[in-house]
Amino acid sequence: MTESVDQYDQVATAFADVEAVISFVRENLEWPSFKDLLGDLRGRRVLDVGCGEGSFTRRIKQLGAAQVVGTDLSPGMIALARQAEARNPQGIAYEVQDLASMPHQGEFDVVTAIHVLHYADTRETMQTMAKTMHANLKPGGRLVVLSANADSSEESETAAGFRTYRPENPREGDKFKVAVRTTPPTEIEVHHWPTTTIVDVLHTAGFTNVDWSLVKPSDSVAPADRERAARCAKNPTSLTITATKP
């Protein structure tokens, strides 16, 4: 997954601009929807795969998790995460690891994956990623995923601050670009994976109780932002998936 390493090292250099654009959908839809599924993390061990610069990782630790480990294949993103940890120490360990080839990190109570699975270039790669997440959970542990919605609408993308350029009638694994509306635009290449495929991959990896739902606006969205949040929620750009290791 070298291409993902290269492009996210490039994104790391313009991260502040990207963060400013995507913060609306993250704060008003993605994080609230994701947080609701995490449950009580007090005293829990959490592995956050594909942690990027650690935005969600730090929030997870602040929810009371006893141990949090963040991994990402991009050295640039991990450098940003470690810088944030140095500025405000929370006891989070960050490691450069590719989920598709990551060695066993331990048995965690919860594994989280935020916008990771759409970087799988083949179904086999995604299957390996799913097996790795499964292997790093203790029996009864939970997987909580935030992933791209393959059926997102142009209206929701525009409101969220980016645009996807999928091929017409995309097939599983087809590559396409996402252009974040920074100046100049920041382009990221990802792959098309229908939700049904992701669910099937998780079942094949050994997960049970696999369930998914579209992200939705938080009840605490400011009145002035509700119209934009409603547009973001029309076939939104993201969805959540939960699963359990028996």
Predicted segments, located by residue:
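C-terminal lobe and adjacent flexible extensions of AdoMet/dcAdoMet transferase-like proteins
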Residues: 201-246
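A short SAM/SAH-binding and catalytic strip from SAM-dependent methyltransferases
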Residues: 110-124
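Mobile, glycine- and charge-enriched loop segments
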Residues: 35-47, 139, 143
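A short glycine-rich, Lys/Arg-flanked "PGG" loop and its adjoining helix->strand segment in the class I
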Residues: 127-139
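SAM-dependent methyltransferase
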Residues: 144-201
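A short acidic, Gly/Pro-enriched loop at the edge of an enzyme's catalytic core
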Residues: 103-111
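Conserved class I S-adenosyl-L-methionine
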Residues: 1-41, 55, 59
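Class I SAM-dependent methyltransferase SAM/SAH-binding core
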Residues: 47-49, 53-101
